[in-house]
Regions:
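Sec-dependent N-terminal signal peptides of Gram-positive bacterial secreted proteins and lipoproteins
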Residues: 1-12
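Active-site-adjacent loops and short helices of periplasmic peptidoglycan-processing enzymes
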Residues: 13-179, 183-192
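Domain-terminus/edge residues, biased toward the C-terminal soluble/receptor-binding domains
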Residues: 158-159, 170-273
Length: 273
């Protein structure tokens, strides 16, 4: 769906039906504005980066669960508050914080990584153990980092976002909107270091002080995988995820002929982003 929306909204105008005109796509009610497709996801938004112009909006202010896209804020906040060469030592916070088969790189107690390695683990492998450890290091505690996340969201103009953890794992009190996630994703895509990490398809963490083997991380973001039906050659990277609670969520940036767009999809069916 994200591929369909980005840079293709005007093309699809002629295909729209009368049903779409009465849908929850607010941009379709703007006189003279290209009509966007009606999609199955509960909410979605496309925003032009430099002017923050809303190109497409469906329920963009509806409060929903953010899912794994939370890690975009986790990564951005870390880049803004640490050096890539800083060292991170795993404690029980990260090692014991992942339960129920959550995504991780199986980091071990007292294992040392650089911040750069941690951010690749978070963005490419969705590593919850590393996200928790980064949060403790940057914020003094996970709760302290979460407060920083919420403060930064307000600074970026978010009005309906509350973060409760740095991983995006389900929490009934954690919520956002498509519009707020677009603002957060814009700030991330505008960060050169974030883009470098997000658009990387593979990254190797060498042997550490504890682990004798390499960890080869493969980016699981479908829009960067040229063998996936969702592949989009102009994509600059992003995050996606799925849980039964949140449905499918996706945020990304794309650039074509000097135009930068931010796309957000929230609460789609499994595999539909």
């Amino acid at each position: 769906l994200a591929c369909t929306l980005i840079f293709q909204t005007p093309v699809l105008a002629a295909e729209e039906t009368a049903e779409t005109q009465t849908s929850s796509i607010s941009t379709n009610s703007i006189s003279g504005w290209p009509q966007g497709p009606d999609i199955t996801s509960t909410a979605a938004m496309i925003m032009e980066d430099s002017t923050q112009t809303t190109v497409y909006a469906k329920n963009m202010d509806q409060v929903l669960y953010p899912g794994a896209t939370v890690k975009v804020m986790t990564t951005l906040l870390t880049l803004e508050n640490a050096q890539l060469s800083d060292q991170v030592t795993m404690t029980a916070t990260g090692v014991s914080g992942v339960t129920d088969g959550g995504a991780s790189i199986s980091a071990q107690l007292d294992e040392v990584f650089t911040v750069e390695q941690c951010l690749y683990a978070i963005m490419l492998a969705s590593a919850n153990d590393v996200a928790l450890q980064i949060a403790e290091q940057i914020g003094g505690s996970v709760d302290g980092f979460v407060q920083m996340m919420n403060n930064r969201a307000v600074e970026l103009g978010c009005t309906n976002t509350v973060f409760t953890n740095p991983t995006g794992l389900p929490d009934e009190n954690q919520h956002t909107t498509a519009h707020d996630m677009a603002l957060i994703t814009k700030a991330a895509i505008d960060n050169e270091s974030f883009r470098a990490i997000a658009e990387t398809t593979s990254y190797t963490i060498p042997a550490t002080n504890v682990s004798g083997g390499e960890r080869v991380l493969t980016n699981n973001f479908s829009m960067l995988n040229n063998t996936n039906a969702s592949y989009y050659q102009y994509c600059l990277g992003g995050r996606e995820g799925y849980t039964e609670t949140t449905g499918s969520t996706l945020v990304c940036g794309a650039e074509k002929k000097g135009v930068y767009l931010i796309a957000v999809i929230v609460q789609g069916a499994s595999g539909t982003t």
